[in-house]
């Protein structure tokens, strides 16, 4: 029923079935296996002919595969765990605007994760105070600051004012530090036309990156913005706001690895991926599975990490995963070990909550990161020696020592809801 409803079938036989080749176009369920440890749950493998899908359209792909079938009365629950995108179809998508290597070349930063910070409070600041917070963070050692996902154009801070003050913060901090800086200017808007207008203004200001909420904004809007960013040299940061409504429950919806694959096809240079160690949901092996699906060219099937199919992206550029949500300096060794160099480690409260202010908060994060990268390059085990490495760095960084004292007892030890088992 699932295969039929998402391809050529309906609830009854219709006379127009005779006007086409149903055998050519229908979806086929080719394998069924029980879910281990569960009664009345099965994993079904369904294959669809490529001719059912419009080239280069994530919107059409999802409309077909996860359309009406999820509302069937006959089904108590239904979840899309994974998709295999054949190279023949993935080559019809242009993917990320630039990709990992081009971004590194634009920023001239290599050999370490990038550092970011979400400006808090996320709502309520005036544009001038918002820009001031960005400046203090960027001059303290950050690579990026960020609009939160729901910062668009509200009465207390209109988008054009925010863009101008953030651009000023970028240029001042670049002049002071000699490093290339950026701020994720959220271009998400109520219409595609308004979204592109905001991206155009960001380009005119000369900033390096804009941002989009790809699930609330929609895949059509996201792909539209991706094309503009590629044509105009802007990096594109993607926030996944609303994803947990879709992916968090184990028995209904779809897994985030599917949304991650869809984003890589639709286009984005960064996407939030969870942290494993922070405040947001995410089991380690499962998170690393879809992080590899975002970054790597070829990923082998590995059910232990939740990867149901071998995926070959051919020449499609990779996406940088962003670890963000409830992280602080004590998490730095684990984050460096888990995510590696091609990642963005984004500290919001873990920067702005520093007792001495924003710039010292960023200095603490930068020192902690540099210490972890140096220790890793020397062959030390970050998982086992992480706390020792951070304590040693505190001896020559009073900013880091103060941060460690503030957050020494902050932990988020909750069992994940969505697990591989």
Curated annotation (Swiss-Prot):
Instruction: Tell me the residues on which N6-carboxylysine occurs.
Output: 146
Please list the residues that bind Mg(2+).
146, 148-149
The record's cofactor note says: Binds 1 Mg(2+) ion per subunit.
Q: What class of enzyme is it?
A: lyase
Q: Name one GO cellular component term.
A: chloroplast
Which modifications occur after translation, per UniProt? The disulfide bond which can form in the large chain dimeric partners within the hexadecamer appears to be associated with oxidative stress and protein turnover.
Name the cofactor(s) required for activity, per the record: Mg(2+)
Q: Which residues constitute the catalytic centre? A: 120, 239
Fetch the Pfam families from UniProt.
RuBisCO_large, RuBisCO_large_N
Positions bound to substrate: 68, 118, 122, 240, 272, 324
Report the locations given in the UniProt record: Plastid, Chloroplast
Q: Which GO terms describe its molecular function?
A: magnesium ion binding; monooxygenase activity; ribulose-bisphosphate carboxylase activity
Question: Which reaction(s) does its UniProt entry say it catalyses?
Answer: 2 (2R)-3-phosphoglycerate + 2 H(+) = D-ribulose 1,5-bisphosphate + CO2 + H2O; D-ribulose 1,5-bisphosphate + O2 = 2-phosphoglycolate + (2R)-3-phosphoglycerate + 2 H(+)
Task: Please state the Enzyme Commission number of this protein.
Answer: 4.1.1.39
Q: Which UniProt keywords apply?
A: Calvin cycle, Carbon dioxide fixation, Chloroplast, Disulfide bond, Lyase, Magnesium, Metal-binding, Monooxygenase, Oxidoreductase, Photorespiration, Photosynthesis, Plastid
Q: Name one GO biological process term.
A: reductive pentose-phosphate cycle
Extra notes? The basic functional RuBisCO is composed of a large chain homodimer in a 'head-to-tail' conformation. In form I RuBisCO this homodimer is arranged in a barrel-like tetramer with the small subunits forming a tetrameric 'cap' on each end of the 'barrel'.
Q: How does it assemble?
A: Heterohexadecamer of 8 large chains and 8 small chains; disulfide-linked. The disulfide link is formed within the large subunit homodimers.
Q: Could you say which protein family the record assigns here?
A: Belongs to the RuBisCO large chain family. Type I subfamily.
Its biological purpose is as follows: RuBisCO catalyzes two reactions: the carboxylation of D-ribulose 1,5-bisphosphate, the primary event in carbon dioxide fixation, as well as the oxidative fragmentation of the pentose substrate in the photorespiration process. Both reactions occur simultaneously and in competition at the same active site.
Q: What is this protein called?
A: Ribulose bisphosphate carboxylase large chain
Source species, please? Aegilops tauschii
Source organism lineage? Answer: Eukaryota, Viridiplantae, Streptophyta, Embryophyta, Tracheophyta
């Amino acid at each position: 029923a699932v295969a039929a409803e998402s391809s050529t079938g309906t609830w009854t036989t219709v006379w127009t079935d005779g006007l086409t080749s149903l055998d050519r176009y229908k979806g086929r369920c080719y394998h069924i296996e029980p879910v281990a440890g569960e009664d009345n749950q099965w994993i079904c493998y369904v294959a669809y002919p490529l001719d059912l899908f419009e080239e280069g359209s994530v919107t059409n792909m999802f409309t077909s595969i996860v359309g009406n079938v999820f509302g069937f009365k006959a089904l108590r629950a239904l979840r899309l765990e994974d998709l295999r995108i054949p190279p023949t179809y993935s080559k019809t998508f242009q993917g990320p605007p630039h990709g990992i290597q081009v971004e590194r070349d634009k920023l001239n930063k290599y050999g370490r994760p990038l550092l970011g910070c979400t400006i808090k409070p996320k709502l309520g600041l005036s544009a001038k105070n918002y820009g001031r917070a960005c400046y203090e963070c960027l001059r303290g050692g950050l690579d990026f600051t960020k609009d939160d996902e729901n910062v668009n154009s509200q009465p207390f801070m209109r988008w054009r004012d925010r863009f101008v003050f953030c651009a000023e913060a970028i240029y001042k901090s670049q002049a002071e530090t000699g490093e290339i800086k950026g701020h994720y200017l959220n271009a998400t808007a109520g219409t595609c036309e308004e979204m592109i207008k905001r991206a155009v203004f960001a380009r005119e200001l000369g900033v390096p990156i804009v941002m989009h909420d790809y699930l609330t904004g929609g895949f059509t809007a996201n792909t539209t913005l991706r094309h503009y960013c590629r044509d105009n040299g802007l990096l594109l940061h993607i926030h996944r706001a609303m994803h947990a409504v879709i992916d968090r429950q184990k028995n209904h919806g779809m897994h985030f690895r599917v949304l991650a694959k869809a984003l890589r096809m639709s286009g984005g240079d960064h996407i939030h991926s969870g942290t494993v160690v922070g405040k947001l949901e995410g089991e380690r092996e499962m998170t690393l599975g879809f992080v590899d699906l975002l970054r790597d060219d070829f990923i082998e099937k590995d059910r232990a990490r939740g990867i149901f199919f071998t995926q070959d992206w051919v020449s499609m550029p990779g996406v940088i995963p962003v670890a963000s949500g409830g992280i602080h300096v004590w998490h730095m060794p684990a984050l460096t070990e888990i995510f590696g160099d091609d990642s963005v480690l984004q500290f919001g409260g873990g920067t702005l909550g520093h007792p001495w202010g924003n710039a010292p908060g960023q200095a603490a994060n930068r020192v902690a990161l540099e210490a972890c990268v140096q220790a890793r390059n020397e062959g030390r085990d970050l998982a086992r020696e992480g706390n020792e490495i951070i304590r040693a760095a505190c001896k020559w960084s009073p900013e880091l020592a103060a941060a460690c004292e503030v957050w020494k007892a902050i932990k988020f030890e909750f069992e994940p809801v969505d697990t591989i088992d």
